[in-house]
């Protein structure tokens, strides 16, 4: 097996360096610094988003228990499926948006994404009991409620994606987008801190907070787009 790996490695190097004549070169420090400055807002934005999206399960596990974590995780997995169409659409049209910078096209795709998210949410809302039984093997009323509450954020995410990452970023406002995402993260951490100080951390309050962050993000993005005339 090791010999096979070495053979594959050597063959790959021969093709890249010998046949295709690819040559490696050191990037000038000035270009590296410029690329770093350009990518920093997006890096900070993604990091901030990951914090307020993924910390919920950690908080529930730390303050409540594994049963609550499993219930929230089940609802979160359904939420990820609901977000998937909007995410795929956003990725597919991003090159076209960056190239043409057509706000009318962005709005058209955004409303299409919202419509799909609404359809998914309505289906999930009326079929949540069946989904819980399918995934858990039993009826859990709390899981159905959490799933319905958390599903609202799928609609908000489909809007926020086209107000932020697919509008501000390709139109040259990456730093504005970064400030909005950092603001969302700070809002989430502040609200979670207040819940902790008041002893109000429950599965329902954490879920409402997750939706509340998306509402805050929506308001922030609408305000920023309005100020920029987008």
Describe each region flagged by the PLM.
Residues 31-38, 42, 58-80, 140-145, ...:
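Interfacial/gating helices of multi-pass transporter permease domains
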Residues 98-99, 154-182:
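Membrane-interface junctions at transmembrane-helix termini in multi-pass inner-membrane proteins
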Residues 49, 72-91, 120, 150-157:
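Transmembrane helix-bundle signature of multi-pass secondary active exporters and lipid flippases
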Residues 9-53, 92, 96-104, 227-230:
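Interhelical loop/hinge segments that connect adjacent transmembrane helices in multipass membrane
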């Amino acid at each position: 097996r090791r010999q096979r790996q070495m053979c594959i490695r050597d063959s790959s190097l021969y093709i890249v360096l010998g046949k295709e004549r690819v040559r490696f070169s050191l990037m000038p420090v000035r270009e590296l610094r410029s690329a770093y400055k350009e990518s920093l807002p997006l890096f900070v934005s993604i990091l901030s988003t990951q914090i307020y999206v993924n910390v919920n399960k950690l908080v529930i596990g730390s303050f409540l228990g594994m049963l609550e974590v499993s219930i929230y995780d089940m609802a979160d997995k359904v939420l990820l499926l609901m977000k998937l169409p909007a995410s795929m659409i956003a990725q597919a049209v991003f090159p076209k948006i960056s190239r043409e910078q057509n706000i009318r096209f962005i709005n058209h795709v955004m409303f299409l994404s919202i419509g799909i998210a609404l359809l998914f949410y309505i289906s999930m809302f009326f079929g949540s009991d069946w989904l819980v039984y399918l995934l858990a093997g039993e009826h859990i009323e709390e899981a159905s409620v959490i799933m319905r509450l958390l599903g609202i954020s799928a609609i908000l995410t489909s809007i926020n994606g086209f107000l932020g990452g697919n509008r501000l970023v390709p139109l040259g406002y990456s730093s504005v987008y970064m400030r909005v995402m950092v603001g969302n993260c700070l809002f989430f951490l502040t609200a979670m801190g207040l819940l902790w100080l008041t002893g109000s951390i429950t599965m329902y309050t954490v879920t409402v907070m997750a939706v509340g962050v998306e509402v805050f993000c929506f308001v922030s993005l609408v305000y920023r787009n309005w100020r920029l005339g987008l």
